[in-house]
Structure formats: structure tokens, C-alpha cells
């Protein structure tokens, strides 16, 4: 019985279903007489005081700035593992998904920009349709079971990891606010300490987490988005240490320890906190405005065109090969699934339009619609192309 529960918790489809439940619950609460309770819950003030340190934020921002930093720490651990010991460890393995991921970022961004070039504030959301929600996309793919070659699952995972790496770079370069020099100096000191600990082969996970918290606080205060602290911490934790004849794999241990927390608490809570859209506040003209249309078309059309188009071109030019035992139509189906932006797109949306409340409902609904269309069409294509 215990084994079955553990297996269920590690199934991608279980994670996807939980995210759907969290989203539907948020939509129900926001559009019911309980909407005031939902809104007040998200805006509950939470303060932390420790000596001179004082951080006060509503619960929603603790989720977006705090818990999502833990999520990006987990993503950073995944990226490091794949680079050192996995699907990104060899150029030949990462060429095809990297090219496809590049297309999956460039084409949706250009499509969004083409619809919003006239409005500088609206144009700030160009990165929203470039994201892929790996948990949700793999969840849809897992519904097809063994009918899909394992190589396609590996491709989608690798593409999403490269996509996440791109999202991290985008956040660092384009969604950084006014900088605080003092906080950046403190963050630099924390990074230096982590680097020294790495070189000295420190094996205490608690020590890394303690310095990591200091790094997160300083980055939070610096104007750089706090989630980047999670990535930096992950990359500075030693992958494998051989000490006194004993092997310590800190990265794998931490990644394994965070798996359930990230997928069954952090991501569902993020979806619950950010997917609540008041449908009564959205008119059809607003839904078909340039920003929502840029997001919907970017996710559903731009993403599949970019991933499939760049991938197909790479195959035709003999730069890369299709995943083993997969067909071109199956690759197209997976390219469509890459348009499930969901939590990652909602997160970038919260950064792009945090001061522009005019978009805050229609753009979120656009993320949900674009992701839903990508999930449904991707599933149909793959089920038809992989009929038993």
C-alpha cells in the first residue's frame, strides 16, 4: 500500500491534476460570494522581524517572492544535475531540445510584440508566452502512458529545463527594478561565502541553507528578483563530494527532499494564489485586447510554431535528429504541449504587470486559455498519432 502511494505521488499526472484542482478552486472562490474571503486571505499581512531586519509583505507576495525562490532553487538543482550527469551533459544530447527551446521562446515573444509594439507598458509582457510549465506538460503526456516513446518525454523534460534557464536569464535582465547598492554588496558577500564553502567541500546542508537565506533576504532588498537567489544557491552547492572515502551527493539529496514540497505544496499554492480571475470584471473586448491575444496566441500558436519549426529546420539541416523511435507528428504534438505555460507564465505575468492592474484579470485568463488549448490539442494530436 505504501509503495502504491509513493508511486502515485511521483506520477506527473497526479501533479497535473492537483494543479487543475487548485486553479478551479481559485476560480470558484473568486467568482462566488466567498471572493472577499479569498482576496483577504491573499492580502493577509505577514511580517518577519529579526533585530534590525524587517520584512512585511501580503501573503500573495510571500508566495511569489519566497516560495517561488524555493521552486527556482529546485529548478537550479535540476539544471545542475542535468548539466553534470544528465541529458545536458553532452552537446549531442542537448542540441535538439536547445534549438527547439530557442524557437519556443523567440517566436511567441515576436508574436506578442507584433500585437503590442504600440504600447510600451503592454510590451513589458513579451516574455509571458515564452514559458513552459514542466509539471503540467509532463502530466498531460503521462496520460498517454507507454503509447509515447520515452525519448519524447526526455525531450520535453530537457526542453523545459532549457526553457526554465531562459526564463531565469529573462527575469535577471528584464524584470529587475531599482537597485540597492548596499543590499547587492551583502548579496555578493553571501555568494562569496557560498563559493568558498563549495571549494572547501563543506558537506553541511544546513550551512548552505543558512547562508542561502541571508542571500535571499539581501537579493529581496536589492531590487533584483528574489527567485534568482534560489538559482544561485543551487548552482553553488557541490554536486558530488568525496570526503574520507565517502561520497556525498548534496544536489541529488536536496532535489529529492524538495520534490514533494515543490510539486504538492509550492506549485499548487502558487496556482491557487494567482489563478483567481474574476470573470465578471472581464468584457469580451478586454479579453480580445492586444495583451490577452498576444498571450493566448503566443502560447497556443507561437510556442508550437517555434518549437516545431526550429526543430524541423534543425533536422532538415542535419544539425540534430528527432528523438529515438518518434515520428514527426508525435514531435509536433509535444511541441504543442510546450505551450502549456500556466504557473511559469502566471509568474512572469506577475513580474511584468505588477504595477499595471488594468491587465491583471484579462492577462491571467489569457494564460489559462492559451495553456488549456495547448493541453487539449497536444493531447488530441498525440493520442491520434500514437493509437494502439
From Swiss-Prot:
GO terms, biological process: regulation of pH
InterPro entries referenced in this protein's UniProt entry, alphabetically: Na/H_antiporter_dom_sf, NhaA
Membrane-spanning parts: 14-34, 59-79, 95-115, 125-145, 154-174, 177-197, 200-220, 222-242, 257-277, 295-315, 328-348, 362-382
Catalytic activity: Na(+)(in) + 2 H(+)(out) = Na(+)(out) + 2 H(+)(in)
Pfam families: Na_H_antiport_1 (PF06965)
Subcellular location: Cell inner membrane
One GO cellular component, as annotated: plasma membrane
Keywords assigned: Antiport, Cell inner membrane, Cell membrane, Ion transport, Membrane, Sodium, Sodium transport, Transmembrane, Transmembrane helix, Transport
MF GO annotations: sodium:proton antiporter activity
Primary residence: membrane
Domain of life: Bacteria
Protein's membrane topology: Multi-pass membrane protein
PANTHER family linked to this entry: NA(+)_H(+) ANTIPORTER NHAA (PTHR30341:SF0), SODIUM ION/PROTON ANTIPORTER NHAA-RELATED (PTHR30341)
Family, per entry: Belongs to the NhaA Na(+)/H(+) (TC 2.A.33) antiporter family.
Purpose: Na(+)/H(+) antiporter that extrudes sodium in exchange for external protons.
Protein name: Na(+)/H(+) antiporter NhaA
Lineage: Bacteria, Pseudomonadati, Campylobacterota, Epsilonproteobacteria, Nautiliales
Gene: nhaA
